[in-house]
């Protein structure tokens, strides 16, 4: 089989169409064209063509991978998953990853270090959340343990406290005890240890005093009473007390407030 003509593709000047015996047969990247010294008049066997096609697949995949990496640093697993989605053959994926490693495009340790530092500085994620994300990105336990040393306990507490302050602002209608529990629960879900979560909850609510809690209770009592006005007095009282207890106020505190403020649930005559 002989190459009878070679033409540059219209939409991609770095790719060439190869015609064998006057018929289009395959296309190749410019680098593959030069490597295999493809030119008009050259004779190729079926094995030659198959080898060239495989080399071109690797070249195309390499170009795609480099473009994929141009947006941000990636882990080896992220690149492997990307290439598989591009329907690259397994042999091509392995060869592309080897070439990228040789070109210093892949380094999981450097990736993990950069990713961890970025997450610590730009987000308020807890260490366990970052660890889970690194696992999902294919990092080994050894690498994860190494890079997580960057997340020192004092920085964890600082970030957890900032997160706690945000949680507190969204839940400013609850008693201090309930608010602290809400903060602890949310922080644990965000990847912080229970110990750090407790310290952050205490720190975030440290400025809440008795007067603040009394003010919150007053507003909640007024709101809950209005909501339960349609019920009979005994039911309205029970629903009000239950609702307030669910917000973290103790039964004794509620009863004392109702008594001291002479709040009655009896129907007015």
UniProtKB/Swiss-Prot annotation:
Its main location: cytoplasm. GO terms for cellular component: cytoplasm. Keywords: Cytoplasm. The keyword Cytoplasm applies. GO terms for biological process: regulation of DNA repair. Signal peptide: none annotated. It is found in: Cytoplasm. The keyword NADP does not apply. InterPro entries: RecX_HTH_1st, RecX_HTH_2nd, RecX_HTH_3rd, Regulatory_RecX, WH-like_DNA-bd_sf. Pfam families: RecX_HTH1 (PF21982), RecX_HTH2 (PF02631), RecX_HTH3 (PF21981). Belongs to the RecX family. Modulates RecA activity. NCBIfam families: PRK14135.1. This is Regulatory protein RecX. It comes from Listeria innocua serovar 6a (strain ATCC BAA-680 / CLIP 11262). The lineage of its organism: Bacteria, Bacillati, Bacillota, Bacilli, Bacillales. The gene is recX.
């Amino acid at each position: 089989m002989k190459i009878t003509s070679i033409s540059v593709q219209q939409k991609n000047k770095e790719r060439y169409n190869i015609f064998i015996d006057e018929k289009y047969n395959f296309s190749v990247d410019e680098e593959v064209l030069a490597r295999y010294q493809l030119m008009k008049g050259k004779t190729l066997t079926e094995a030659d063509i198959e080898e060239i096609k495989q080399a071109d697949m690797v070249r195309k995949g390499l170009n795609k991978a480099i473009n994929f990496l141009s947006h941000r640093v990636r882990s080896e697993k992220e690149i492997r998953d990307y290439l598989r989605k591009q329907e690259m053959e397994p042999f091509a994926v392995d060869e592309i990853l080897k070439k990228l490693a040789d070109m210093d495009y892949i380094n999981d340790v450097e990736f993990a270090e950069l990713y961890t530092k970025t997450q610590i500085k730009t987000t308020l994620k807890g260490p366990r959340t970052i660890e889970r994300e690194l696992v999902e990105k294919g990092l080994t336990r050894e690498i994860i343990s190494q890079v997580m040393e960057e997340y020192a306990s004092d920085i964890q507490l600082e970030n957890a406290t900032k997160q706690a302050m945000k949680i507190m602002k969204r839940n400013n209608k609850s008693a201090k005890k309930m608010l602290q529990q809400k903060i602890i629960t949310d922080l644990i879900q965000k990847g912080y240890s229970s110990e750090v979560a407790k310290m952050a909850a205490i720190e975030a609510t440290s400025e809440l005093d008795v007067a603040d809690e009394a003010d919150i209770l007053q507003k909640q009592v007024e709101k809950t009473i209005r909501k339960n006005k349609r019920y009979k007095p005994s039911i309205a009282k029970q629903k009000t007390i239950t609702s307030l207890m669910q917000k973290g106020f103790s039964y004794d505190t509620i009863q004392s407030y109702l008594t001291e403020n002479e709040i009655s649930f009896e129907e007015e005559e």
